[in-house]
Amino acid sequence: TAKRLQNYRKGQPDFYLEELYYQFGRYLLIASSRPGNMPANLQGIWHNNVDGPWRVDYHNNINIQMNYWPACSTNLYECTLPLIDFIRTLVKPGQKTAQAYFGTRGWTASISANIFGFTTPLESEEMAWNFNPMAGPWLATHVWEYYDYTRDKKFLKETGYDLIKSSAQFATDFLWRKPDGTYTAAPSTSPEHGPIDEGTTFVHAVIRE
């Protein structure tokens, strides 16, 4: 495999190597995200310390989302269920966060979360990475994606709809009307990509979705 990787870097086609990596990615998710357990965190389930990097928590600024991007599209619907169960535990504390920090309806989360329902920003003044009010709506897109692939109406009725609706309420209330009559999101930022601004692409994209 090392030789094949070396040749691949030189531009030699190797479709089997690509398939091997594809299946390896599926294996990692299968091994670290099974129904009835916690979802895959920053390191999946693989680290050799009592306290792993970044406290082995759940980073909602793209990390946990990236873990699950291939789940439904690679026919691993059941691997998404631990993530959805985890998101459900964030809703009630996330409602308090939405009201206390932003004065909105609905629920949201922030950059970091854990199994104890942590949804507020971290104790840091570095808002370029710590400020992420669209973490909740971004997580909610995974709930919709699960329904979009499975078309499980019972799931949508009993689990998905209320969670997504509450998240959409937060996103709607987060918008403010400008003097020209258009709506924008402010303050907003793209996680770990620059300062606080008005109407960043990331925030508007999540709200539209």
Task: Name the predicted role of every residue range.
Residues Y22, R26, I164-Q169:
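Short, hydrophobic/amphipathic alpha-helical packing segments
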Residues F15-E19, K157-D162:
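Alpha-helical scaffolds flanking conserved acidic
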Residues N41-D57, R105-E158, S166-E209:
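The feature captures the catalytic groove of carbohydrate-active enzymes
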Residues F24, L28-A31, I64-E78, P133, ...:
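Alpha-helical support elements that line or immediately flank enzyme active sites
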Residues T97-G106:
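Beta-lactam-recognizing serine transpeptidase/beta-lactamase-like catalytic domain environment
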Residues L17, V56-E78, L90-K96, H193-E209:
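Extended ligand-binding clefts on enzyme/binding-domain cores
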